[in-house]
Structure formats: C-alpha cells, structure tokens
A protein has these predicted regions:
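ATP-binding N-terminal substructure of ATP-dependent carboxylate-amine bond-forming enzymes
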Residues: 1-83
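Hydrophobic residues in well-ordered beta-strands that form the structural core
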Residues: 17, 79-81, 107, 128, ...
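Short, charged, surface-exposed secondary-structure boundary motifs
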Residues: 26-29, 43-46, 87-93, 136-138, ...
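Alpha-helix termination/capping residues and helix-transition junctions
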Residues: 27, 50, 102, 157-158, ...
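Conserved residues at the C-terminal ends of beta-strands
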Residues: 36, 59, 111, 192, ...
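Short glycine-rich anion-binding loops that position phosphate/pyrophosphate groups of nucleotides
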Residues: 61-63, 133, 259
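Active-site nucleotide/adenylate-binding loops and adjacent lid/helix of ATP-dependent enzymes
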Residues: 89-172, 182-185, 207-223, 227
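Phosphate-binding core of ATP-grasp and ATP-grasp-like enzymes
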Residues: 155-163, 168-212, 219-253, 257-261
C-alpha cells in the first residue's frame, strides 16, 4: 500500500492507514497509523467516523476492498455497494453474476471436497482455485482425476471461506485490463500482456504494457470488460480485469477485482 500512501501525501492529503502491525514501511510513511486488522470493519468504520474522513481506498487487496466499501457505505462516501463487493471479491458469486449477465467466462462448480464431484462429467484439464483469494494464491491446473483432491485441499487451505472452485480451463494468452469507474462511467486505462510460470501455479513473471494487440481486438476487449463491470455493479472504483484471448480471438473473463491491480 505504500505507493498509494505516498501518492496521497504528494496530493496534499492527510493519510490515515489501517493494518495489522507488522513493521511494514507504510506504518511509518502514513501520517497516522492504526494497528487494526483490515477485517475489523466495525472498528475501522467507527474510527473513520471519529476522524471525519473524506474518502477511503485501497490497492491490490480484495480483502481490504470489502472494508473500504463497508466504510464508504457507512459514511455516505464514494464507493461501490456491498452487493457489488460480494460479486467482485467472491469468485463463486462472480461466476454466477457473469452467467446471469451473459458475460463470457469459464463454467465452474463450488465444492468443499473432491467427494462432491463423484459422478460429475469433468472435462480435464480443470483449474482449481480458492473462492476468495487474489494474487494467484492456491491456483492449480489439474490434468486428471488423480490430482483433484490434493488441489481442492490446497485451494481450501489458501482461502478464508475454506471452499474451492473447480472450473473449465480457458486456453489462450493472458491479459489484464485496468479501468477507473465513476458514477457508472467506465474509463479504460491500460491493457497488459502477461507472462506466467504456466501450470501448475501460474505465477506472474513479466508484463508488456501497452499490450501489442490490434485496434479491433482492443475494442472488443473494452466492450466485454465494460459490460462485465456493469454486471458486477462496479460504479465507483478502480478495477483490475483478468482475461484470456484464444488463438481464434475469443475473449473469456477469468475474474475482475473492484480495486487497483
């Protein structure tokens, strides 16, 4: 979070930062630091009410985005609704929203154990991931039934809700798209081509920005992403959209976070 703190201070803003005390640099660069876990929504809301804050934000954290929007809603500040927050931080809720909204994304099944998939007609390979984590944590590409149970347990162990998504594998080149939305109007910032370690964990290793894509492909990506932002109800925040484009040019949404990437 330190780049955000420094930028806010450079803009002349007084910064009040909340996090569990861990000796991180932001604890000293902030004007005021409060050793309160970011999951303690009520405590942070009450402290922000006492301070009389004018705005609240985070970067690169789905967990913090939940508290950010809770505080924004509680104080009548600019932010997204809690319904939007659920859809943009819980991958199962996101998949259901995409399905209902007609947005192109992989099919998925919510599970708590491999036993729940007995008799299911899975087409391998599949991707197994936690329901509620970011940063590629707990993601595994599974090539066949033998590795499924271990991948599910790994995903559950990495998540907060102790549940996993088993979803179809989307082939293609990975990209991400950054946008800013204000009062429901979406503004495109950048599209990035991503490089990863590949299976099984897909850890990001490099980026090219702007992504080297043709104008018509970029226009199609914007259309898909903007529609998906509407589906999730992202109206007042940054967003980080992850997608894949197949060799044939088909776009499939992997997930969207209602915060900076």
């Amino acid at each position: 979070q330190n780049p955000l703190i420094l930028k806010a201070k450079a803009m002349g803003l007084e910064t009040h930062v909340f996090a569990w005390a861990a000796g991180d640099v932001g604890e000293t660069t902030a004007d005021h630091f409060y050793p309160i876990s970011i999951v303690e929504k009520e405590q942070i809301l009450e402290q922000c009410r006492r301070i009389g804050i004018d705005g609240v934000c985070t970067i690169a954290s789905d967990l913090a985005a939940i508290t950010v929007n809770y505080v924004a809603n509680g104080l009548g500040l600019c932010g997204n609704t809690m319904e939007c927050t659920e859809k943009s931080t819980n991958k199962h809720a996101m998949r259901l929203a995409f399905e209902a909204g007609g947005d192109p994304s992989p099919k998925s099944i919510l599970v708590h154990s491999a036993a729940e998939l007995e008799g299911a007609a899975l087409e391998y390979p599949v991707i197994v991931k936690p329901v509620d984590r970011s940063g590629s944590r707990g993601i595994t590409k599974v090539e066949g039934p033998a590795g499924l149970a271990a991948a599910i347990e790994n995903a559950k162990g990495q998540g907060f809700e102790k549940a996993a998504l088993v979803e179809e594998f989307a082939a293609g080149q990975e990209y991400s798209v950054e946008c800013i939305s204000y009062q429901g109007q979406h503004h495109f910032l950048a599209m990035t081509k991503k490089f990863t370690t590949g299976a099984p964990g897909f850890v990001e290793t490099g980026h090219i920005q702007p992504a080297p894509v043709q104008p018509e492909q970029l226009a199609a990506v914007k259309q898909v992403v903007f529609h998906a932002l509407d589906t999730l109800g992202i109206r007042n925040s940054a967003s980080h959209s992850e997608l894949k484009i197949s060799p044939a040019g088909t776009i499939r949404l992997i997930e969207i976070g209602g915060r900076m990437g």
